[in-house]
């Protein structure tokens, strides 16, 4: 009895599966078309060969859909590479225009920097010499570098020998401020002060009185006791 019931159920199952089953032929395109995207449906219309060749045909169809896009990508890349030098040149032009506007806006400061450029270069090449120059007073620099400091002094532009002569007298002028007694004993100063004396006689008299002037500064009491000074002055 149980065997009959089992056979009956088997027959019912087979009949139900046969009623709902779909038969696909060997050359049918339904399974492949359902798996591929819509834009490849035309490429697989001829796929009705052996199932072993179907993956190869699908690969060819996919490659055929991608290859038309490659030339466009290559053209865009080459165009970008050609535009890179133009972009670099444009950036340089913009930078040059900005620097030019900065120079025009502050022309005085730019000119001053250009005039001091030799000293800045000396500072980068020889730091010791540059620091030594920085320690010098500003009024002594034209004596060492008359060409660079020529625009800063009108006397140097009009009469360079007189300007250089004044620069040579500068150390002695500083000596006069520190020690007047030592300043008056400098014999090398007499030729520079010839223009002060009205004539040669007065200049000679000043030269003869130079030791006594030194004595007057060091010891005024002894100076007034000198008979030579009394006879010379009175």
Swiss-Prot record:
Keyword Lyase in annotation: no
Q: Name one GO molecular function term.
A: nutrient reservoir activity
**Is the keyword Magnesium in the record?**
no
Signal peptide feature range: 1-21
Pfam families referenced in this protein's UniProt entry, alphabetically: Zein
Q: Which UniProt keywords apply?
A: Repeat, Seed storage protein, Signal, Storage protein
PANTHER family hit by this protein: ZEIN-ALPHA PMS2
Instruction: Quote additional remarks.
Output: The alpha zeins of 19 kDa and 22 kDa account for 70% of the total zein fraction. They are encoded by a large multigene family. Structurally, 22K and 19K zeins are composed of nine adjacent, topologically antiparallel helices clustered within a distorted cylinder.
Q: Which family does it belong to?
A: Belongs to the zein family.
Write out the function statement from the record.
Zeins are major seed storage proteins.
Protein name, as recorded: Zein-alpha GZ19AB11
